[in-house]
């Protein structure tokens, strides 16, 4: 037979090559994948595998099927035949432990049989020697008797001999008798000595065998047989048991058939025993002398709690936490309910909750960080730490109340007219610009002043070095001014106050200074450290002083940054451009951002395909404190995300996907839990009306601001639910979502495409466009007001005094009244007052004047009034007529 390689042999026997090479190595043959294998080496490997795994089958399955007919008596004295088929299947497993126990039992049995045979042989030998000695004694006795007879005969013949001859004969006889007794005594002693020696030898051998096999055999053989697994039986026992059981079933069937009735089983009948009892009795022994013992479970439940080290990630399900602690999921749910939180077995819980539950159940918690890949990616960055830090331009954020002139002030500095381009003349985006002055460069961030843009102002304060607080001299401190002060204090950045509109006649700078003192902004004139600059964005008054104050403050702060190395920064704003895709406005804080760099930005990543400055010009690099627009990200990032340049695009993608999954898990884990204390609040949720809205905006910041503002409009009766929101134009998907959820579509500075308009027309959806956030919020308020349940108010329209009471066969008591105030109308509800206390409330049944039915009676006229289902009208009562007015409610 030709030799084959290891790889071809592995393909032939369908096993991995590595496993086959390892098996050759275990057999003592060193082979590689391309080496050839001879027939002898194959046989050597096969012999090794047989020794390793064994070639005998370890499992034997017996299947039997018996059919029988059972006659069952029924009503009417007839019997009904029922066909019975009994199918039996038993599997006997020959495990290595069973084989070892069987071999040990066989060895012990053979040793006992050998000892018994040796004892029997010794006893037989002793018996043979004893019989031989008895035969010898018998022969001696017979010889003595024969000699005695011969002597007697000789005595008779020689009776006449002399006494001299007789005396020696008697002496010989006595001597022979003494010799015979001595021989008998010696034979008995020899026999007894040999028997004692044989007994000692057998006992000594038994002791040696017991000492050698101590630890190998169980103590008593009978107990080993009892405690052995009754499944480990020989095939002969199995067949015998099957035959015996079949014979019992067949005999029972025949007895039923002969008697026509099922005979009652006796109390001691073996058929009443369970199958396990019968097999246990068969495993104990076939002789039946020993009573079957009850099987005892060898495993005892531990009574001491086991404390484990539980490793918990940032999120974990209840089932996973239970598996880590080796307990049932129901126990974890009970522990969470004791802590005041309800959860299902598949619910995701956060790390803090899981830690509390595990520690409550007595386990040690090990918190695991899952962002090793992200840390490794961030550590493999060339940050230029060895380079010297250089001075950089300050980042200045313009903040203040709406319409106080922030953008106009910045426009005058930049000598542009951006404010006219903003819808409604208010800023709705963060604008980032850098300006070259005579004393250096300054980067400005213009934030919205409207109340809806709180989060955008907070982001601007966090990314800035200096805050310029713009306050109108004729308007003073307003709510958004106070909020801007709070953002500046939270970000711990210095403030420069610009008192704008100083050219107006109603300007009062001292009033502004006084009002700001209440909020911790103290002017230098009043002994504080905050510079106040009076400016006019319209005529340019004080602009140079403002820039000088900003640069002076920056010089005091000693702002520095490293220009070399990989860049890092923050996203100021982001939006989706129809032609360019996702666009992000990034403020570079460290390093230099170059075209072609791989960036990781929050949940998104990508390569910088293009860079543009605030004027729309293409640039190739941007240093610290320079705002740029970058293209090439995978999607629109969230405003405020950190931008980092990394080396590997593949790892950047993995980190971005990991962040997305982590954010989703954390969001699910931290959703509103069904806690015990708000169960009743959840029961009343069905009574609340919902206004579903789909919002699409041009930039991420505006979308976020609109969503926050609309959610704040929710009341106890009407709830605003944002079904979907995003950046970019209104697409067919958005229209389909609105149709499915019954929502209205609001577009802020965006429009719907043709397919979306087609869906809107087909489904009859409400689509509205806005360019100013004021209008959007006001119209949503109106829509919510229409969903509010109206209020009802009772208004008194007339009073009538009862002057006399008449009886009518048709209406009962009729009150003759004088209208003292207002108008009495026929179809309105009434109240009957007695001593200014309401005693009845109902409606008019009849209103007449001079026997004529009328619809109303005015002040100063008499009339007859019949009250429906009420006859206890008395003189002096007052009848009050009122009407119910519906009042529409509005949301403030």
Swiss-Prot record:
Residues 536-538 are annotated as: G5. InterPro entries: DNA-bd_dom_put_sf, EF-G-like_DII, EFTu-like_2, IF2_assoc_dom_bac, IF2_II, IF2_N, P-loop_NTPase, Small_GTP-bd. GO terms for cellular component: cytosol. Pfam families: EF-G_D2 (PF22042), GTP_EFTU (PF00009), GTP_EFTU_D2 (PF03144), IF-2 (PF11987), IF2_assoc (PF08364), IF2_N (PF04760). Residues 51-296 are annotated as: Disordered. Residues 99-217, 239-254, 270-283 have a biased composition (Basic and acidic residues). It is found in: Cytoplasm. One of the essential components for the initiation of protein synthesis. Protects formylmethionyl-tRNA from spontaneous hydrolysis and promotes its binding to the 30S ribosomal subunits. Also involved in the hydrolysis of GTP during the formation of the 70S ribosomal complex. This is Translation initiation factor IF-2. It comes from Yersinia enterocolitica serotype O:8 / biotype 1B (strain NCTC 13174 / 8081).
